[in-house]
Amino acid sequence: METSSSLPLSPISIEPEQPSHRDYDITTRRGVGTTGNPIELCTNHFNVSVRQPDVVFYQYTVSITTENGDAVDGTGISRKLMDQLFKTYSSDLDGKRLAYDGEKTLYTVGPLPQNEFDFLVIVEGSFSKRDCGVSDGGSSSGTCKRSKRSFLPRSYKVQIHYAAEIPLKTVLGTQRGAYTPDKSAQDALRVLDIVLRQQAAERGCLLVRQAFFHSDGHPMKVGGGVIGIRGLHSSFRPTHGGLSLNIDVSTTMILEPGPVIEFLKANQSVETPRQIDWIKAAKMLKHMRVKATHRNMEFKIIGLSSKPCNQQLFSMKIKDGEREVPIREITVYDYFKQTYTEPISSAYFPCLDVGKPDRPNYLPLEFCNLVSLQRYTKPLSGRQRVLLVESSRQKPLERIKTLNDAMHTYCYDKDPFLAGCGISIEKEMTQVEGRVLKPPMLKFGKNEDFQPCNGRWNFNNKMLLEPRAIKSWAIVNFSFPCDSSHISRELISCGMRKGIEIDRPFALVEEDPQYKKAGPVERVEKMIATMKLKFPDPPHFILCILPERKTSDIYGPWKKICLTEEGIHTQCICPIKISDQYLTNVLLKINSKLGGINSLLGIEYSYNIPLINKIPTLILGMDVSHGPPGRADVPSVAAVVGSKCWPLISRYRAAVRTQSPRLEMIDSLFQPIENTEKGDNGIMNELFVEFYRTSRARKPKQIIIFRDGVSESQFEQVLKIEVDQIIKAYQRLGESDVPKFTVIVAQKNHHTKLFQAKGPENVPAGTVVDTKIVHPTNYDFYMCAHAGKIGTSRPAHYHVLLDEIGFSPDDLQNLIHSLSYVNQRSTTATSIVAPVRYAHLAAAQVAQFTKFEGISEDGKVPELPRLHENVEGNMFFC
């Protein structure tokens, strides 16, 4: 087998780039596939029929202000106001039902009697917030007692103005093959989805985009004062078979309702309130909603008092005519003790501040309970993620029952607004015919051919195709209680059985116990210093034993130093149990990082891949990793992997860059160096040069792009921004022509599920669907390449945005299916193609480099250190 070491290293001639001048339109479907065995399936799409296709939605803008002109924020009060408006002024609105988005837009079926309205809406039943706590500008006990017996109505001004007309029939062309995906169609779908959200809001649900959650939605405790709850995602979708309603089970995280003190104890894993870190508590509690136990009223927390409850003073006031007159200073503790005669155990702890920045309003902790259905958006710990995944799994039949029950319970088509459109929704799932593609043949060592069964294989009694000897290596242990010598012996023994020649490690380095409590960066620096004292020469490879699985803070600094400064490949492990299977999986990763090949596709080994074998073809996987929710100071990390050693499609190199937080389009594919005509620091320059270097001095004439992480609204940006950058980078290398492109978006974050119509198991590996539930005109299909053993399988949704190469549907689907079998660190078909998976791994690993960094004070995104030349060309991310 020819490898990169035998290929010429001729330089690429570099010239200024030519203007790209390419405008691409999203391609339409070219037909459907035919290969594979047919299989009967059902899916969580429910057919929608419309008896009144000529209905027109009328859109109106809504402005809500207080009587003195202040804008009203918050969907809760806004929805309450609009409900009251409809009850009060229904006749003025001609009795028309309103679909309100909770913000600034409402819709009706047909027009309202006039284009503009000004309403005065009075909402009763609200207590005055400032009368239920104690405020620095606050009220006395006398005023508070009077407020117990009185409701305070408030008046609001609501203005409604005509904005636009949206014909419903723009989304109904799907049934006649005449669907046009323009803005009107998207607007009509949005109206229908708003109706679903409004229906859920009326039932008191928590709304998260197009999903809604009940307080009794199968709570799942995951620790830390957080619980997961199960709800439903629902959205209308245009499909090849007509309009459909897509319903799926969804899960979100909420705060566990109850006493605030109990939440803080659980969140910080402490036994008593005295152990609570109040600085952390203040950050955690900010913006949470609580209900006062001494008053039936909710508040939003803005912070904690600066002093304990028994020391925090406020001015007690009484009303003297129209004026409030201070009578004396009193502590919050004394006020509540005198007024409510209840013992207060939180006297030495801070109070909750539920007022405003210029007017604090204090409540003792034990008088406050967290209200239900408050979404928790902070990152989960590794343990919490595991518990959530385990608790939220549903087998196919269980999920089918949940969805069917929901359709019968919620009666979507009985909604007055939808009924006014003549919309009816079938109660049974859509039936669809799929195909099961034949798994590709794999090539192992000793010229062994093997065909996987249901997306799985193993290396029992098999040799790696191209093993890399491990000659100079060491083991370092960051205080994990294990026998490092035993691990090395077992690894050597396992390597022999797989064809890997492994020498004994020349050093076993244990962490100095005095640094065990130090910070992660310091621990890594001390370990590196110890290694350099013990090692005569840098090792080729290091096996690193971490103290925790998946959540170790040492991982990022360790990888950063080894890959960027030392140029040493490393494999991190946390061996809870040593077994042959565990060590085999570790060796698959090590061999890939060192430049070996574990297995190849049979058609790849024999140079027989359609449309790729004869024309130099570069395959790219692209992804962007963002920081955790709520961290706007953490830069995003863009990663692109490119194939090498053409015509192979199993070997890749990664290039990684940071970019502005939450920016989804990759902006570093082409980065010309200022004041030069030849320099390019962009991602694609690295990958083009690597392809040329390892592919017998050939430049790619075809480029296949697999893009992950973009939504349908960003498809055109991929073509106009990212493909354009790739063309410019290519032309910078001295080429006047432009390669042919095939651009495919790979999505996993969607809500379509496939089920066997005649069996309880998940759909078999290789299942593909390209009819009925796909887009009416665009080129897309669903593929479940992997075999789901736990829960319900989620297929990948592939959108073909551009196909200049000209794949037939069968050739493209089989190529994508085959690319799910080339992940060198896996012995199962992956749920998404390997290039996308590799890009995700590279972005996630390098994101750990910046874990302890943020945006600088001048707003600049920190640049990543470049990988050391010893490791940059290999698959360090495996």
From Swiss-Prot:
Region entry Disordered, spans: 1-25
Keyword Isomerase annotated: no
Keywords carried by this UniProt record: Nucleus, Plant defense, Repressor, Ribonucleoprotein, RNA-binding, RNA-mediated gene silencing, Transcription, Transcription regulation, Translation regulation
Compartments where located: Nucleus
Sequence ranges of Low complexity compositional bias: 1-17
Keyword Plastid appears in the UniProt entry: no
Purpose of the protein: Involved in transcriptional gene silencing (TGS). Component of the RISC complex that associate with the small interfering RNA (siRNA) pathway involved in direct cytosine methylation at endogenous DNA repeats. Required for the accumulation of specific siRNAs derived from transgene and heterochromatin-related endogenous loci. Involved in RNA-directed DNA methylation (RdDM) at specific endogenous loci. Probably not required for the accumulation of siRNAs derived from transgene inverted repeats that induce post-transcriptional gene silencing (PTGS).
Stated name of the protein: Protein argonaute 6
Gene: AGO6
